[in-house]
């Protein structure tokens, strides 16, 4: 499904051209893969998830540097609650379990996340962390990096809490699309117990 050729979409320098390629080439893939993930998440959690695909409606000049789909339990949106994201940048696919700055009660989640530090360090040794979904900066899982993300999320207005994986386009998995898709799905589903814990607060 996802292939290295998909990154060529971001070679188009125009807003109209890039958006058209996103809408006609990537979004159909998001629809298919998103439906698969919806089913897997429903089985794993006994909850109903809605698929949201970025539409870039506020873009009037600069072409988007990335595009994504999100899965949340609300049909009205996803940024104000814990959710999953799978998306493309110009050089990567990203898979995140995300708690974003828009969450109205995000500081309520910080103590619970902090209490899970030991388990996070043991269960997600090969995962990445970030505190800002708008940048490419990511941090490998480590005690210091986890503390950094926790502090940014708890103590700064724009701080976010992102756990997941980044697949750079030179990753050998892109030579085997079926293995890539399976790995992305496994990466996301491994975070389901954390999602359920967070949502049980």
UniProtKB/Swiss-Prot annotation:
InterPro entries: UPF0637 (IPR009403), UPF0637_domain_sf (IPR053707). Disulfide bonds: none annotated. It comes from the Bacteria. Belongs to the UPF0637 family. This is UPF0637 protein LCA_0842. It comes from Latilactobacillus sakei subsp. sakei (strain 23K). The lineage of its organism: Bacteria, Bacillati, Bacillota, Bacilli, Lactobacillales.
